[in-house]
Every structure is written in C-alpha cells, then in structure tokens.
From Swiss-Prot:
It comes from the Eukaryota. Keywords: Chaperone, Mitochondrion, Transit peptide. It is found in: Mitochondrion matrix. It comes from Drosophila erecta (Fruit fly). One of its GO terms (cellular component) is mitochondrial matrix. Signal peptide: none annotated. Residues 1-23 form a transit peptide. This is Succinate dehydrogenase assembly factor 2-A, mitochondrial.
C-alpha cells in the first residue's frame, strides 16, 4: 500500500513538474493601459430604417380603467432594460393608482407608443429633448421622479401589493 502511494506521488510530481517550471520562468506582463473615459460622450442616434416596419400598438378603447392600470403596472415592470424597469416600476408604484382616466391614457401612450425604450430613458433623464407629442403632464411627473429629490434608494423594483 505504501509503495502504491509513493508511486502515485512520484507520478503526480513528475506530471506537474514541467508545468511548475514553465510557470516559474514566466515574466509578469505590464498592466493594461487605462481606459479613456470622458463625461461628454456623444450619443449616436440612428433613424429607424424604412424596411423594418414596427407594428402599431393596438388601442384598447373599451378597456376598464382598473384593468388598464394593472396592465400598465405589469408593463412598467417588464420593459426589457434594467434602467427603465427601475424608473418606470417605481414611478408606477408611486403614481399610477392616483391617475385619472386621461392621465392613465397619457402614460399608456408614453410607454407603449414609443418604439425604442432608450428614447424614454433619454427623455426622462433630460439627455435628449422630449418631442411635443410626449411632453405631457405625465412626462413632467416622470422627470421629477427621475431627479429623485427625496433621495429614495431605487436598487430594486418595489414589491407588488397583494
């Protein structure tokens, strides 16, 4: 038994010995150059090509107000990009239940009428100017919410009320 153990140790030492030698001969590589970072990076914005038509969002004229609010709450939480998920879900949790039917329709048009979620993000954070058709009372509330004057932590989406 001891003879087998000793043989195994000899073999493992022999197998890994060349590897140890090659590692000891390696020189340290110089650190990579620092990444260039500026605060005035330009946002490249391309026009949507004509050959990729985007489907129109279906209007729901006979949808009850409470059902519409529930749908908008879900859609505010499931945007597909974390930035808008956090901003819109916290905004909807704070304001959506107090919206009138007209305000709810404006919010529906804002989050479902825009084909690119990055546009909503850039408008809400005042990186790009908001187009007139989306510059509504709801967009003003969203911009105030994004400024976060209360300094509320928004690291995760709010819990759903059950």
């Amino acid at each position: 038994m001891l003879r087998q153990l000793r043989l195994t140790m000899d073999i493992s030492g022999w197998i890994f010995l060349p590897w140890r030698r090659s590692m000891s001969n390696m020189k340290e590589s110089p650190p990579p150059p620092p990444l260039a970072s500026t605060f005035d990076d330009v946002i490249v914005d391309y026009e949507d090509p004509d050959y990729l038509p985007l489907p129109e969002y279906p209007l729901r004229p006979n949808e009850p107000l409470q059902t519409r609010k529930q749908r908008l709450l879900y859609q505010s939480r499931k945007r597909g990009m974390l930035e808008n998920d956090l901003l819109l879900s916290t905004f909807a949790a704070k304001h959506l239940q107090s919206f009138s039917a007209e305000q709810t329709a404006q919010y529906d048009q804002l989050i479902n009428g825009v084909s690119n979620d990055w546009d909503i993000y850039y408008w809400a954070t005042d990186v790009k100017p908001t187009p007139k058709e989306y510059d509504t009372e709801i967009m003003g509330l969203l911009k105030e919410h994004v400024k976060n004057a209360e300094r509320v932590s928004r690291l995760r989406q709010p819990d759903l009320n059950t």
